[in-house]
Amino acid sequence: MVDLATRAAPEAGAASPPDHIADAIRRIGPRFDPAVRSEFIRLYADLLRGRPQPATRIARDVAYGPDARHLMDLHVPLHSPAKSLPVLAYFHGGGYVEGHKNLAGDLIYGCLAEYFVQSGLIVANVTYRLAPQAPWPEGARDVGRAARWLDDHVAEFGGDPRRLVLMGHSAGGTHVAACALHAGLRDAKRPPVAGLVLVSGTFDVEDTEQPPNIAAYYGTDRSSYARKSTIRNLATGPYPPMLIATAEFDPQRFRDHADALARRLTELGAAPERLRIPGHNHVSEIYHVGTSDESLGPHVAAFCKKVAGS
C-alpha cells in the first residue's frame, strides 16, 4: 500500500476549502445525513456558478442500456485531439436510493467532469439504477454495462477504451469496487480496466449498520451480507491499479472500510494507493472538484496519467 496521506497534491493550487465552507465542515464534523448533503449542494453550487466556462463539448443523456436511468454525459475537448485520449467514467453517490449524474443543474458532477477534461481525459458522467427497484447487485452490473458501452463506442468521441479508469464516490464507489473486484460479479471476459478510483465506498456490508437505504439495496436478510461484501469475496488477481480515498471528516465506517480494503489488497500482492483528504467531509471531498480547491483533483489526474497515459 502506498500511503499518500502526507503528500501535497501534484501541481496543486489551493488545497483547502474556502473559509466559509471549511467552517461548515468543522462545525458538522463526521456527521452525514440528507440535511448535510443539501447544505453542501447549496454551498458548492454557489461557488461553482462563478467558474470560467471550459472549452469542452458535452453529449448529454447518451443511453448505455434499456432503463430510463441508463444514461451518461460524455464530456470531450472542444477541439478534437490529435490522438485518442484516456477515459474516466465517474459514478455518483446517493446512498443507493437516490442521486443523479447532475445536481444543481449541471454544476455538481458536471464541473468535476469538466475539470478532468482539462486534465487530458474524456469523461463519462454516469447515472445508474437505484434501489429498491434495482437491488444488489444491479448497481455493480450497471457499472459493467456502462464500461462495455464505452468499450464499443467511446472511440467515436475520441477516447481509447483500452485506457479506461472507473471512478466512484460513496455508493458509486461501492458499485465500482463490486463490479471490478467481487469474485461473483467481475466480468472475466472483459479486458481489465486501467485503474480504479474508489472514494469513500462501502466494501464490507456485513460490518455496516442497517439503515433503510442499506436494506433497500442489500435486502433485510443480514445472513446474505457476507456473500455480498466485496472485501470478503475478492476475485483472484491480478488487480488493476487503485487509488482508495476518504476524507478527514468522513463517517468512521468509510475510513475503516478503505483501510481494510487497502490492507487486504496489499496482503494479496496489490499496491493500492491510499489517500486521506484533509479538511473535507463525505460530500465536500467530491463537490469541490472544479473549484480553486485542489485537494483531490490533482491526485486523481496524476493517478490517471500514471495508469492510463496521456
Predicted feature locations:
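Alpha/beta-hydrolase superfamily serine-hydrolase fold, recognizing
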Residues: 2-310
